[in-house]
């Protein structure tokens, strides 16, 4: 399942990579022909005639899966491409009745720049954090660009400001595990700028903070610190990017902490998208109303 808003440029690569897999696209009020393109590529399309946000789109996708008897679904971003065999590995990891969700290793791709190297370090730390969670707790955070879950394990996601955090918490509360599958990978667009990294991290931390029982490894200081050290040991060339990555992450956390105390920010986060340019355009449109 793919929740898409103006993704006509990136969607074809993903649909081609998915091949004959059953694909559901929720077109969330796109104006660039995303829905038509998805239908032409053979996907099932649900259409919102106005933009309703990621949570509403994901809820429609979950309802469709339940109504049509899908026991396990994979949710992914429109700008992502799964590694060969990774979807199959995700599905296989869900065979145990004790498992309600599963996530993969995320690898950003893009032009080698300052923002790319910082981004690459941040995502490698997340992967190491999930590995540590599996060792210490036998379960891990679900969130990411691509993950699988059993729809029956999830209560309504409508109104949530961070959908994958919401799913992860739902699965945990219902007594299921979320597993990390490190040999399954997904490639996705790296952050386009320092501002884009800040937006992404700020949104993620906001989502973690509004859920007191967040499962995110970044909210466990011991795991986060150990994950950073493991990531640097895995690839020492990441060391020059450690300080800017840590400072950027701390600033993102402080911004999110402030946002979490502002009720009017919740509506803005509900409509948030991960593409920096789209958020800039949306903010500009709101300021001119």
Q: What are the roles of these predicted feature ranges?
A:
Residues 35-64:
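Conserved donor nucleotide-binding strand/loop of the catalytic core
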Residues 9-13, 32-40:
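Acidic helix N-cap motif at the loop->helix transition within catalytic regions
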Residues 6-20:
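Short, well-formed alpha-helical segments that are part of the catalytic scaffolds
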Residues 70-79:
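Short beta-strand-to-loop acidic/aromatic patch adjacent to the donor-nucleotide binding site
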Residues 206-289:
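Terminal low-complexity segments of carbohydrate-biosynthetic enzymes
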Residues 56-57, 93-149, 153, 202-205:
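Long helical/loop segments within the catalytic core of UDP-sugar-dependent glycosyltransferases
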Residues 17, 27-35, 50, 80-81:
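A conserved acidic beta->alpha catalytic loop
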Residues 94, 103, 107-122, 158-222:
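Catalytic donor/gating beta->alpha subdomain of glycosyltransferases that bind UDP-sugars
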């Amino acid at each position: 399942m793919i929740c898409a808003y103006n993704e006509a440029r990136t969607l074809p690569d993903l649909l081609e990579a998915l091949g004959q897999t059953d694909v559901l696209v929720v077109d969330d009020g796109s104006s660039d022909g995303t829905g038509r393109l998805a239908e032409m590529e053979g996907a099932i399309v649900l259409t919102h005639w106005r933009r309703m946000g990621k949570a509403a789109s994901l809820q429609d996708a979950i309802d469709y899966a339940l109504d049509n008897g899908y026991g396990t679904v994979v949710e992914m971003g429109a700008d992502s491409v799964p590694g060969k065999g990774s979807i199959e590995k995700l599905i296989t990891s869900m065979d145990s009745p004790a498992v309600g969700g599963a996530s993969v290793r995320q690898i950003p791709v893009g032009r080698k720049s300052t923002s790319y190297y910082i981004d690459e370090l941040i995502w490698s730390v997340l992967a190491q954090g999930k590995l540590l969670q599996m060792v210490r707790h036998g379960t891990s955070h679900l969130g990411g660009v691509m993950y699988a879950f059993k729809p029956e394990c999830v209560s309504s996601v409508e109104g949530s400001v961070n959908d994958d955090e919401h799913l992860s918490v739902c699965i945990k509360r219902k007594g299921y595990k979320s597993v990390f599958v490190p040999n399954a990978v997904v490639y996705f667009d790296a952050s386009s700028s320092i501002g884009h990294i800040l937006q992404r991290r700020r949104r993620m931390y906001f989502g973690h903070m509004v859920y007191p029982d967040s499962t995110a490894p970044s909210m466990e200081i011991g795991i986060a610190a150990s994950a950073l050290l493991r990531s640097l040991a895995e690839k020492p060339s990441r060391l020059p990017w450690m300080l800017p990555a840590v400072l950027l992450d701390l600033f993102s956390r402080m911004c999110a902490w402030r946002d979490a105390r502002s009720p009017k920010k919740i509506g803005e986060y509900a409509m948030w998208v991960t593409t920096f340019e789209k958020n800039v355009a949306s903010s500009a449109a709101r300021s001119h109303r």
